[in-house]
Amino acid sequence: MPTLLRLKKRRFQCKNCRRITVAKTSIVEKNCQISNLVRQKVSQLLTEKMSLTDIARRLRVSTSTVYRKLDQFSFKEHFDKLPRVMSWDEFGFKKGELAFVETKLITILDNHRQTTIRNYFLKYPLKIRQKIRFITMDMSGSYMLLVRRFFLNVQIIIDCFHIIQHLGRAFLKTRIAIMNQFDKKSLPYRALKNHWRLFQKDRCKLSLNSFYSKTFRQTLAPHEVIAKTLVFSKELTDYYTLYQLLLFHFQEKRVGEFFDLIEENRSKVNHYFQTVFRIFLRHKQYIQNALETDYSNAKLEATNKLNKDIKRLDFGFRNFINFKKRVFITLNMHKKRTYPVLYRC
């Protein structure tokens, strides 16, 4: 419930100069009607996934008050140090942004043009940039050119998620192409369409629990569904075997076997897999770094999810600076648990 305090301030008059002073209080600032505790609560709620309008409605203050509190925050950028490991990724905000993160978010640039990225990192001395050892990113070729130019001692690491994603998409398109060869009312078509998720999964991670399949009208385990479906197409069986072998070698970090299998089947597969294999061979050294190290873009992907949540909750910030402040407040401020204290005046 909102509480209204009627505060009467005592006045003191100097007997010598006759000047009058008013007693000060820690409850509110001078010439303000909103208490300091409410302002502190605004700062606390800015770290949560709440829109600025919801914060204002919850604390019974205006939205402008919340915006003014947000404007009071400032984050000074230090160009005298960089982490040993960095992650690069982009997310959508109007024209697109690029984020850099280690254990804490370093910065968010207002676009992902090479000029913007170059001008930002040129603010760091060469000696500082040479201390970076690893940078994880997706397969965007434009970033790799910048990394090799401005970070001389860096090893580029392709995020493992994007490697698996490329393989999964190639097999998904292959399965759809084979599925469309059958009549839409036939059993092979319905089996490939209804149980597509089982084919995308790693075979080693399939559940052992049985379920009732409406397609086959019987209770089957996931691996039994796959076995019954693969009987309909020799081509699909070959591609599924290749897909699962690539996943196995990648999960077991077998670099040699992974690329040997790609080289062996490069000219035998369809254009979906040929495109993926061509990309993998072009970035062979970076994928090898991913298999030989434990670094990934997991933290940054989680950060991007938070950025999108903030953007959605606030119906999109028109001001990029305010959006950047909100992200930094949410990520970099330490949240301490507070307890209500009851006292008598």
Regions found by a protein language model. Give the residues of each.
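A generic secondary-structure signal for well-formed alpha-helical elements
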Residues: 50, 143, 154, 171-174, ...
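Short alpha-helix plus adjacent loop in nuclease-associated cores
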Residues: 163-184
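Short, positively charged, Gly/Tyr-enriched micro-motifs
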Residues: 1-97, 130-132, 142, 149, ...
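Active-site beta-loop-alpha junctions of metal-dependent nucleic acid enzymes
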Residues: 31, 104-128, 134
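Conserved, well-folded catalytic cores of nucleic-acid-processing
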Residues: 20, 73-76, 150, 170, ...
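Conserved residues at beta->alpha junctions
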Residues: 46, 111, 138
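Acidic/histidine-rich catalytic cores and adjacent linkers
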Residues: 70, 95-100, 127-155, 161-165, ...
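Conserved beta-strand scaffold positions in the cores of enzyme catalytic domains, especially
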Residues: 85, 156-157
